[in-house]
Every structure is written in C-alpha cells, then in structure tokens.
Amino acid sequence: MVIIKKTHNSFSLKHRHCNHTLKFGRLGLKILSFSKITENQFNLIERLSLKFLKNLSGNKKLIKIWSLVPFNLTLTKLSSEARMGKGKGAVYSRAFFLRPGSILFEFEGVSKHQLTQISSILRKKTSFRIVEVQLPSK
C-alpha cells in the first residue's frame, strides 16, 4: 500500500543540474524554463507523444520511451467553506517541479525528424519551452 504524504516544502528557483544528460535513449526532450506539471498534464503529454509515434511508425518499429521525472509534490485542497485553522486539506493530485535543463523524455528507435515533429506538437500543448537533444555520435 502506497501512502501519499503531504509535502510542505517549496522548491527554490536555483538553476541546478541533476537530470540534464541522456541516460538510456539516443534522443530526448529537454526543458528550458521553470514549470510545475500535474500528474494529469504529464499523462496527457505522454499519451500525445505515444499516439503520434505510433501513427508515424505504423506499429512496425520498436520504439522505447523513458520518463525519469519523479513526482515530488502533493497538491492539497480544502473546501471553499472551510474556516482558518482546519489543516492543509486532502491530497487531490501529485505534481513535480521542473528546472531548466532537466530531461522530460528519452527516446530510442525514433528518427531526428520524428522527434522534431513530436516537440513541435508538445510546444503547442505545454506552457514551458522544450528543446530536442541527442547523444553525440561516435
């Protein structure tokens, strides 16, 4: 049983590199601005990219996608009629705080052209800036 605890910490807006290199895939999507994404928004982004990749490849190629972003926030909410001093409220969703330079997705089995098409679609759907990255060729 997983217990989701309420978080009280706020995240600093300092530029810190901890998840800025590709670990598994050959291509990836990197974030260039601070942002907070809820679990529903992240699932929507993931479903859009999967759907677009399946349409492009025609289910013929083996495509792998990794997302290494941990959910580090719990979003809580009290009812609108609650008075002061009644606590923080119930957890209604999870989210994570993104810093510039963090990798959102890593891809394997995707061409550079397909990745640019995916990123152009995701730029229209999200409020943060996205850039494509790739491993240097040997």
Swiss-Prot record:
Location of this chain's protein in the cell: Mitochondrion
GO biological process annotation, one example: mitochondrial translation
Molecular function terms, GO-annotated: rRNA binding; structural constituent of ribosome
GO (cellular component) term, any one: mitochondrial large ribosomal subunit
Keyword annotations of the record: Mitochondrion, Ribonucleoprotein, Ribosomal protein
Key word Ribosomal protein present: yes
Family label: Belongs to the universal ribosomal protein uL16 family.
Protein name: Large ribosomal subunit protein uL16m
Source organism: Chondrus crispus
